[in-house]
UniProtKB/Swiss-Prot annotation:
Glycosylated. Interacts with heterotrimeric G(i) proteins. Interacts with ARRB1 and ARRB2. Interacts with MLANA. It is linked to Albinism ocular 1: Form of albinism affecting only the eye. Pigment of the hair and skin is normal or only slightly diluted. Eyes may be severely affected with photophobia and reduced visual acuity. Nystagmus or strabismus are often associated. The irides and fundus are depigmented. Residues 1-28, 100-124, 171-191, 270-292 are extracellular. This is G-protein coupled receptor 143. It comes from Homo sapiens (Human). Keywords: Albinism, Cell membrane, Disease variant, G-protein coupled receptor, Glycoprotein, Lysosome, Membrane, Receptor, Transducer, Transmembrane, Transmembrane helix. Changing residue 235 to K: In OA1; not delivered at the cell surface of melanocytic and non-melanocytic cells. The chain crosses the membrane at residues 29-49, 79-99, 125-145, 150-170, 192-212, 249-269, 293-313. One of its GO terms (cellular component) is cell junction. Residues 50-78, 146-149, 213-248, 314-404 are cytoplasmic. Belongs to the G-protein coupled receptor OA family. Residues 355-366 have a biased composition (Polar residues).
Amino acid sequence: MASPRLGTFCCPTRDAATQLVLSFQPRAFHALCLGSGGLRLALGLLQLLPGRRPAGPGSPATSPPASVRILRAAAACDLLGCLGMVIRSTVWLGFPNFVDSVSDMNHTEIWPAAFCVGSAMWIQLLYSACFWWLFCYAVDAYLVIRRSAGLSTILLYHIMAWGLATLLCVEGAAMLYYPSVSRCERGLDHAIPHYVTMYLPLLLVLVANPILFQKTVTAVASLLKGRQGIYTENERRMGAVIKIRFFKIMLVLIICWLSNIINESLLFYLEMQTDINGGSLKPVRTAAKTTWFIMGILNPAQGFLLSLAFYGWTGCSLGFQSPRKEIQWESLTTSAAEGAHPSPLMPHENPASGKVSQVGGQTSDEALSMLSEGSDASTIEIHTASESCNKNEGDPALPTHGDL
C-alpha cells in the first residue's frame, strides 16, 4: 500500500491516528499487502509473456512515440513501487523482532530504521513519479493532437516527473525526520510537506487529467471532421475508442486511490481531536481501519488495471477474451487519399500543396493511432496502409507521400 503513513511508522514518537492504523491487525494487513502485490506482479508478468501483434518483417523500424515512452516509464515506476511493497511486507511478516526495534522509544537501531525509512521513501518516490508520468501522458496527448508534438518534449517530461518527485520526496523526508528518526518532531506542520509529496501529484492527476482528456477528445473530433469535411461512421468509432480509453484510465485511478484520500481525511480529522478514543468517534475509527485495508488491496492493483485500460488483455491465451474491435486504419487512409483526387474543374499543377496535405494527414493518423492504441503496432498499421497507397503513385491524380 502506498501511503505517506508508511514514513511516519518509522518515528517512535508517531501521532495517535497513525498508531491507530499501525496497531490494527498488523500481520493480517501486511499479509494482505503481500498477497495483493504478489498477484499484481504475477499478472503483470503474464501480460508481458507473448506479444499480441508482432511486427511483420517489412515493418518500419521506427522509434516509439513519446506517449509509448511515457507509458513505459509509468509502468516501470508502478512495478518497482509494487515490488517495494512486497519486500516491505515480507520483512514485516518474516522478521517481527527486526521491525519491533523501530518502535523502541528508548533507542532506535540503525538498520531497522534505515530499512523502514528507505522502503517508505522508495515506495513514495516511485508512486509519486508514476502520478507525474500519468499527468505527462495527458499533457502529451493534448499537445500531439493540437500541434503534433511529443518526441521533442520527452526530455522535459523526464525532468518534470523525476525532478519534482525527487525534490518533493527529499523535502518531505527532511521535514518529517527532523532532527533525527529517533526523535521525530510531532505536529502537522512537520508532516504536511511529507504528505504533499504523494497527494499533490495524485490530486493533480484526478483533477487536471479529466480536463485535458476532455480537451483532447474535443480536438480529436475537430481533427477528424477537418480531414475530409465529413464525420463518417469509421471516424466516429475512432473518436469513441479514444474517449472510452480515457474514461477507463480515470476509472482505474479513482477506484485505486479514492480510498487513500478518504482514509487520510479521516485520520487527519482524528488527529485534530483531543481524544480519538471517544465513543462518538467510533464510526470514524471504524471507517479509517476499513479504508486502510482497502488501500492494501487496491493500491498495488493500479498497474495491472491500467495495463488493461490501455491495451486490454495481452497475455497468455486463456480462451475467454473477446475479440478486439480494430479501427479500419487502412480504409481511413485510403479514403483520405481518395479525397485528395483533384476535381476536373481544378488545376492539376500544384503537387506541393497535395504533398503537404498528405503529410499532414499522415501525421494526424499517427497521432490518432497513438491515442487509440498506445502501442507501436498501431503506428505500424498506418505506415502499412500508407505504403499500400504509395503503390498507386503511377496514377497522376494521386499525390505522393512525403517523408516525416
